[in-house]
């Protein structure tokens, strides 16, 4: 199984997993990590993006039969102040994954910082053009899927509403399940038929996100 654990401490898993980290230059700002049972063949931490390249936002590991990529997509910020940078990032990340997929199947997981469709957040009308639900970000995610990738959760549950992976700390949002689905497992289309399960572990606490899970035969 492949998992994304946003808040699990490395010491808890040290004895069982190989740890691969990608750090931001700015201490405490951002970063990604992958814990794997096997040593990767190679690790890629930069994607040639003109923005956010020193923020530890990608941790890509090559294994014998596939690429596994953990990503933390830049947030567009209040008022979409960082939207232009976000669009540059989305374009480069899409190209990066597409290049990897030419070699072997790709699994990409992480915080993509976008609710793709109205079903993916509780209040789409009042959040329209807010960061994470702007037309531009949603179109960018559509282009990523169109480049040859499958949203594993929606493949299995195309009509499931009220399934979220992030909740604001304000207004008892998690208790009321006023959330967003912004954490995904994407699978290259050539391997999408091997997906056997996808879950959102919303009973697991530790941050404003919860883990997401993919089961796939690779």
Describe every region a protein language model picked out.
Residues 38-218:
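Active-site regions of metal-assisted phosphoester/phosphodiester hydrolases
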Residues 20-29, 47:
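A short, structured active-site edge motif that brings together acidic residues
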Residues 27-33, 141-142:
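Short, charged, surface-exposed secondary-structure boundary motifs
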Residues 15, 29-31, 57:
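A generic structural signal for short beta-strands and their flanking turns/coil linkers
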């Amino acid at each position: 199984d492949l998992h994304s654990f946003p808040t699990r401490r490395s010491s808890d898993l040290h004895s069982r997993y190989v740890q691969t980290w990608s750090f931001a230059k700015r201490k405490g700002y951002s970063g990604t990590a992958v814990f794997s049972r096997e040593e990767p063949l190679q690790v890629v931490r930069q994607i040639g993006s003109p923005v956010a390249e020193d923020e530890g936002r990608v941790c890509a590991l090559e294994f014998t039969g596939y690429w596994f990529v953990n990503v933390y997509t830049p947030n567009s910020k209040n008022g979409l102040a960082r939207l232009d940078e976000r669009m540059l990032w989305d374009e480069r990340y899409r190209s990066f994954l597409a290049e990897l997929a030419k070699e072997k199947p790709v699994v990409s997981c992480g915080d993509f910082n976008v609710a793709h469709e109205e079903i993916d957040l509780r209040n789409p009308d009042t959040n329209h053009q807010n960061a994470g639900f702007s037309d531009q970000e949603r179109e960018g995610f559509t282009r990523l899927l169109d480049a040859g990738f499958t949203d594993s959760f929606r493949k299995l549950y195309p009509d499931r509403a009220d399934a979220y992976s992030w909740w604001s700390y304000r207004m008892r949002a998690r208790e009321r399940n006023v959330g967003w689905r912004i954490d995904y497992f994407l699978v290259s289309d050539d391997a999408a038929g091997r997906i056997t399960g996808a879950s959102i572990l919303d009973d697991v606490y530790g941050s404003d996100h919860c883990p997401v899970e993919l089961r796939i035969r690779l």
